[in-house]
Amino acid sequence: MQVIRHQDRDSAGLVGLGARVLLLAPLANEALFRRIAGLGGRVDLEVELYSALDALINDPADWDLFVMDCDAFGGLEAGRRAFAMLGLAAERVPMILASAGCQTQVFPEDRRAPILLRAPATATSLRVAMEHALHNRLNFRF
């Protein structure tokens, strides 16, 4: 008989499994960093908006996912502006925008559109968002 006991309540499984994630968030948002890492993502934290956008635009192939804590940078509209500034890089790197101002979570069929999450993102909502964003990557992993 096997008994499996789940200890980590912030983690919901390793859906990110080695995915390189650029997280744009203030240093104070440790929970989001830990949740992404707990889902298997290799997280690089950036605290400055234009530095993060520069990293994505200059080498989009280096990243599997971009996650932005919009509330620290002016809300959901700031996240949408950042998405628009990415231009063609936004088509290559899936984007998750987390904001307390998000009324309805959105998981768009168009893979080029950003995923919208209500902040603070729970382990479950983040897992679903990462599965959705990394869907094509997950299909080719096996």
What is the role of each PLM region?
Residues 23-28, 47-49, 68-72, 98-101, ...:
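Structural motif
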Residues 34-35, 57, 78-80, 108-110:
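Short amphipathic alpha-helical segments
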Residues 41-49, 55:
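Short hydrophobic/Thr-rich beta-strand motif most characteristic of the beta2 strand and flanking loop
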Residues 53, 62-92, 100-103:
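Conserved phosphotransfer microenvironments
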Residues 28-33, 75-76, 102-107:
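Short, charged/polar "capping" segments at the starts of alpha-helices
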Residues 2-5, 46-50, 77, 120:
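Conserved phosphate-coordination/catalytic loops
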Residues 45-47, 96-139:
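Output/docking surface of receiver
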Residues 1-41, 57, 61-62, 84-91, ...:
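Non-catalytic signal-transmission and effector/linker regions of two-component phosphorelay proteins
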